[in-house]
Amino acid sequence: NRFFYFIGHSIFHPLVKGLFVLLVLTGILGLPEKWALAVDFQTYLKGAQAEVSRHKEIIREDPLDAIAYFELGMAYLALGRHEDEVEAYLEAIKLNHKYTVAHYNLSMAYDLLKDGPNAIKHMLRAQDLYIQKRNHARIRNVKRQLNLLYLKYQDKTKTPKN
């Protein structure tokens, strides 16, 4: 069962199904595109909600699974529930303080919530961790994101809340 946890299920499978439905409804059946898009979005939402439920179940079984909390945060991102996304990433980081991608995603979530100081704080932490790992491609990406965050929150980079 853990094998499928890593490769068998993804929030993107429902998205692919939704795109297939879009193709069938518009191309083959000739329905208006806006109807097909509504069906596609409903499929996407159902898939994202199923992912939230699945990861909550995994967390119930193993509350110390940092990856499950991270994946839960990704599912909340897909639903646009950024406050919940932040909580899930924070829990993942609490369980593994060197979870680099969780720091990166947490920074992006804080940015979506317009919390510049926390966005910068966690992006800096992600940068430090990528430097330790010597992951140069990720370091460049984080530096670009940091530059964007500094530009966006020039006068708001005081002290983060968390």
Which residues fall in each region the model found?
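Conserved structural position within tetratricopeptide repeats
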Residues: 57-61, 90-94, 128
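Register position in tetratricopeptide repeats
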Residues: 78, 112, 145-152
